[in-house]
Structures are given as structure tokens and as C-alpha cells.
């Protein structure tokens, strides 16, 4: 009988030890932290090309956050203010206003109807980031390489993201849809060059 009691005692003791070990965080384990994007310090530059040249400019982040676990970024969400589009290469004020008016209305991004675009990170593998980009009311998964640095609770990230506008229903001037457009064609793909700064 004493032997049975001893065995039961050992089993119960072992059970409590295992439960305690399971509930105790592993030494060195990292907790995920959310870093707020500094929208003033962060920059997004865009570049769009056509047969006869190209245009470039900036667009602002409205808000954003990065999720970091130790030295690695594991998630994040960002909101882009589509009404903040600026063209920096057209110096003539009247032509610049006309150009911005064109790309923000019906033929292109319809910013009154779609005032923001969003990007949500869904996967991070090595240097590659995958996420859901919502633009012009359409959501598509995109993958791109990024360089991320974590120093003293602050994160910086740079990336160049090619975006095919026709995937998001923006078809104006695309040879894919208008075969006879000739030298008035506008490239389907434009680039977003991103520099992010985020901290606690």
C-alpha cells in the first residue's frame, strides 16, 4: 500500500512540475511589440513611366504600425492618403495641377471614392514580405524584398514595390486593353519606393 501511495505521490508531483514548466516563459523568449510608424519621417516616392517619358512624386502615409519580435518584423498595417499625391517633376504650375487632377479622378485612382489605400503584412520569409494591398477598391496579394533594421527600439525599412495598376482596375492608357494607343501608352507597372521609420 505504501508503495502505491509513493507512486501516486511521484506522479502528482511530476504533473505539477510539468505544468509549472509549461507556464514559465522560456529564458530569452521575445515578446512581440507594436511600433508606431512615424508618418513625418517616413517617405513614399512614386515613379510612373510612359512611352514618351516619366513622372515622379510623393504620397503620404496617413498611419501605420509594424509588429516586431526581437530583431524581426513579423507583421504590420499601413494606410496611404491617396489625396496627398504630389508630382515633383512638372514645374509648370498649371500643367502640374492638370496632371494631378487627371490621375486622381475617373481615369485613374478616383481618390474621392477611394481616399485611402491599405497594405497589411500577411507573411515574412527571410527578406521577402507578402501582404494584401488594397488600391482603388481592389485587394491583391503582393510580394517584394525589403531591408529592415532594428536598433534601440526603433525600426527602419526600405523597399521598392512594383505595382501593376491594371490588377486594380486602373486601365487608362494601357496597351493591354488598348492595342492601337501607340506612343500615348502608359506603363502598367509603377513603382513605390518606401522608407519607413517606426518606434515605440
Where are these regions (language model features)?
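Bacterial Sec-dependent N-terminal signal peptides
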Residues: 1-26
Amino acid at each position: 500500500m505504501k508503495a502505491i501511495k509513493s507512486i501516486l505521490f511521484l506522479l502528482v508531483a511530476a504533473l505539477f512540475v510539468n505544468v509549472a514548466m509549461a507556464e514559465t516563459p522560456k529564458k530569452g523568449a521575445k515578446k512581440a511589440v507594436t511600433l508606431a510608424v512615424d508618418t513625418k519621417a517616413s517617405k513614399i516616392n512614386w515613379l510612373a513611366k510612359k512611352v514618351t517619358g516619366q513622372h515622379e512624386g510623393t504620397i503620404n502615409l496617413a498611419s501605420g504600425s509594424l509588429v516586431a519580435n526581437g530583431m524581426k518584423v513579423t507583421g504590420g498595417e499601413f494606410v496611404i492618403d491617396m489625396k496627398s499625391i504630389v508630382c515633383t517633376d512638372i514645374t509648370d504650375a498649371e500643367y502640374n495641377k492638370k496632371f494631378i487632377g487627371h490621375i486622381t479622378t475617373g481615369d485613374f485612382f478616383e481618390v474621392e471614392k477611394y481616399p485611402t489605400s491599405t497594405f497589411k503584412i500577411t507573411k515574412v520569409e527571410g527578406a521577402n514580405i507578402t501582404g494584401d494591398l488594397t488600391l482603388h477598391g481592389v485587394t491583391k496579394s503582393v510580394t517584394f524584398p525589403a531591408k529592415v533594421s532594428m536598433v534601440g527600439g526603433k525600426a527602419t525599412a526600405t523597399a521598392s514595390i512594383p505595382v501593376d495598376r491594371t490588377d486594380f482596375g486602373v486601365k487608362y492608357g494601357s496597351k493591354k486593353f488598348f492595342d492601337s494607343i501607340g506612343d500615348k501608352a502608359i506603363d502598367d507597372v509603377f513603382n513605390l519606393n518606401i522608407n519607413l521609420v517606426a518606434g515605440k
